[in-house]
Regions:
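ABC-family P-loop ATPase nucleotide-binding domains
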Residues: 79-135
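The feature captures the beta-strand-to-loop junction immediately N-terminal to the Walker
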Residues: 33-35
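Helix-to-loop junction immediately C-terminal to a conserved catalytic motif
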Residues: 48
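ABC transporter nucleotide-binding domain
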Residues: 166-181, 185-252
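Catalytic Walker B motif of ABC-type/P-loop ATPase nucleotide-binding domains
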Residues: 148-152
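Conserved structural motif at the start of ABC-family nucleotide-binding domains
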Residues: 2, 17-19
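C-terminal coupling/interaction segments
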Residues: 244-288
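Conserved ABC transporter NBD signature motif
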Residues: 56-70
Length: 288
């Protein structure tokens, strides 16, 4: 199991995140969510060993990712861009990762290239964004790494490829009991995939919650008014207003009491989605 203890990363004088502690159990998908620039990509790069932490440690079965190079064979990061691979050919990428990952399935990735009409001599830079992203995702599956770190994995994929990839990810999880950490702004996708959710905000990485616990920490209401009030409460976040009908997120009992005191004509409870949890956590109507 991947274990993260008191992980801190500072670049120059800027604190990116500090004192992050969590685990990634086998057979789980954890969603990592946060605003743009919160530090999600930096965290993923530190977990895989591409960046050194300022403090703290990342361990695979008690072996340090940063001090024991062979421990990194248990993790694979699919980055949010192909920049680091641009001038390599597909064949060179296969050979590079086959040399590093002892359980690499060369036949798997070769079959994928044949079925997708991708010549192993093509350079990554010659592929479309979607083609390159799909190849990297299939390369991740071919490594058989027990931990996959995915940074905006479906960015650039059309709807059909996205659907097929997500199905494949679920199958992989069931068959191999892979631990997956996904950083993405595609909240609807994460809502249907993730078992757990972890937030990063103002350099604090919160311990993962189950998706059910995260959603149950908030309430979503649709209310009708004779005259819509001006909501002024830190735990009440307006999602939308259409005429005299308001949809909002309530984050606490104090917030619920405040809303009830506005005397709505009608109040309906709505199911909380991951997008609602994101908006309620990071700022409600300010970030719609």
């Amino acid at each position: 199991m991947l274990t993260v203890s008191h992980l801190t990363k500072q670049i120059d004088s800027k604190m990116i995140y500090e004192n992050a502690s969590f685990t990634l159990p086998a057979g789980t998908i954890t969603a990592l969510i946060g605003r743009n620039g919160a530090g999600k990509t930096t965290l993923l790069k530190t977990l895989v060993g591409a960046l050194e932490p300022s403090r703290g440690k990342v361990e695979w079965n008690q072996e340090s990712i940063h001090h024991v190079p062979s421990a990194r064979q248990h993790l694979f990061l699919v980055p949010d861009s192909i920049g680091v691979y641009r001038q390599m050919t597909l064949g060179e990428l296969m050979e590079f990762y086959q040399a590093f990952y002892p359980n690499f399935e060369r036949t798997y990735i070769e079959n994928y290239c044949r079925s997708s009409n991708l010549d192993r001599g093509r350079r990554v830079t010659s592929l479309s964004k979607g083609q390159a992203q799909l190849f990297l995702l299939q390369l991740a599956f071919a490594t058989n790494a027990p931990v996959l770190l995915l940074d905006e994995p479906t960015d650039g994929l059309d709807r059909i490829n996205k659907r097929d990839y997500l199905k494949q990810l679920v199958t992989l999880l069931a068959e191999r009991q892979t631990a997956v950490l996904i950083a993405s702004h595609q909240l609807e996708e994460l809502d249907s995939l993730a078992d757990r959710v972890m937030t990063i905000e103002q350099h604090l990485v919160k311990e993962p919650k189950t998706l059910e616990d995260a959603k149950s920490s908030m309430q979503k209401w649709q209310l009708a008014y004779e005259t819509v009030p001006d909501f002024q409460h830190n735990d009440v976040h307006v999602l939308s207003q259409t005429g005299r009908v308001v949809t909002l997120i309530v984050r606490s009992e104090a917030g619920a009491m405040y809303v009830n005191q506005t005397n709505p004509l009608l109040k309906d409870a709505l199911p909380v989605q991951l997008e609602d949890y994101f908006l309620g956590t990071f700022g409600g109507d300010q970030h719609v």
